[in-house]
Amino acid sequence: MGLLRIPLYRLYERRLERALSNAPKPRHVGVILDGNRRWARLSGLSSPKEGHRAGAEKIFELLDWCDEVGVQVVTLWLLSTDNLARPPEELEPLFEIIENTVRRLCNEGRRVNPMGALDLLPASTAQVMKEAGTTTERNPGLLVNVAVGYGGRREIADAVRSLLLEEAAKGTTLEELAERLDLDDIAKHLYTRGQPDPDLLIRTSGEQRLSGFLLWQSAHSEFYFCEVFWPAFRKIDFLRALRSYSVRQRRFGC
């Protein structure tokens, strides 16, 4: 960033902050952290790992920005179930970065909720995720959902499976369950059970699709698609997303 652009950037940032001071803000923000590999390639870096590492650092900036505006829940989609099919030479360093990121979240006192098919992850990564959820569950402040090995359809299937097992343990027959089953019964078994549904979903890198992110929970969410790659995501990009959200008239229907 040039010397002239730095003060202009700060002025614009403060202008956005003033405009948002009394505006409605989301309680729950979901973010698809997209574009790490493309950012690394366009930046002339030697491997995708460098993009993933830069993207991991950006997470901590985002959480600070969320703290500043009073967001209560952030859901971060770090790795999808589809991504698990990538070559081992890319996944191995990525899992290491994810483990280090989750440990740092714990060390900084964040409340971490692991989301995803942990049984599909390497044992060490799954263990780090599980321990984070257990050791930080009573931490105050911002709740950070960390989605690794996550897929929206898989989450719904897991929720239904969990519900069926719970009801079977009570002796409920399938006919009895089918008779009284409603949406809340399934929602109580989602990875985000007990949390508010996301108000705002952000995807970086210019892709304009959700790819199944929070498929059940996003029925009434507002979407914001940002052109920049995740490692280059700035505070003004976040504030612009909040500004866009603040002027929308939310309709909880068609």
Curated annotation (Swiss-Prot):
Q: Which Pfam families match?
A: Prenyltransf
The protein's matches in CDD domains, at most eight in alphabetical order, are given as: Cis_IPPS (cd00475)
Q: Which UniProt keywords apply?
A: Magnesium, Metal-binding, Transferase
Q: Which InterPro entries match?
A: UPP_synth-like (IPR001441), UPP_synth-like_CS (IPR018520), UPP_synth-like_sf (IPR036424)
One MF term from GO for this chain?
A: ditrans,polycis-polyprenyl diphosphate synthase [(2E,6E)-farnesyl diphosphate specific] activity
Q: Which GO terms describe its biological process?
A: polyprenol biosynthetic process
Site (Important for determining product length): give the residues: L78
Enzyme Commission identifier(s): 2.5.1.68
Q: What binding details are noted for the cofactor?
A: Binds 2 magnesium ions per subunit.
Quick one: which residues bind substrate?
G35, N36, R37, R38, W39, H52, S80, T81, D82, R86, R203, R209, L210, S211
Residues of the site described as May play an important role in product chain-length determination or in allylic substrate recognition mechanisms: I59
Major enzyme class: transferase
Which residues participate directly in catalysis? D34, N83 (proton acceptor)
Output the superkingdom of the source species.
Answer: Bacteria
- Known outcome of mutating I59F: No detectable transferase activity detected
SUPFAM superfamilies the record matches: Undecaprenyl diphosphate synthase
The record lists the catalysed reaction(s) as: isopentenyl diphosphate + (2E)-geranyl diphosphate = (2Z,6E)-farnesyl diphosphate + diphosphate
* GO CC terms: plasma membrane
Cofactor(s) annotated in UniProt: Mg(2+)
Could you say which residues bind Mg(2+) here?
D34, E222
- In UniProt terms, what function does this protein have? Catalyzes the condensation of only one isopentenyl pyrophosphate (IPP) unit in the cis configuration to E-geranyl diphosphate (E-GPP) generating the 15 carbon product (2Z,6E)-farnesyl diphosphate (Z-FPP or EZ-FPP). Only geranyl diphosphate (GPP) can be used as isoprenyl acceptor.
By its UniProt entry, which PANTHER family does this protein fall under?
DEHYDRODOLICHYL DIPHOSPHATE SYNTHASE COMPLEX SUBUNIT DHDDS (PTHR10291:SF43), DEHYDRODOLICHYL DIPHOSPHATE SYNTHASE FAMILY MEMBER (PTHR10291)
Extract the NCBIfam families matched here: PRK14828.1, uppS
Oligomeric and partner information: Homodimer.
**The family this protein is said to belong to:** Belongs to the UPP synthase family. Z-FPP synthase subfamily.
What name appears for this protein in its UniProt entry? (2Z,6E)-farnesyl diphosphate synthase
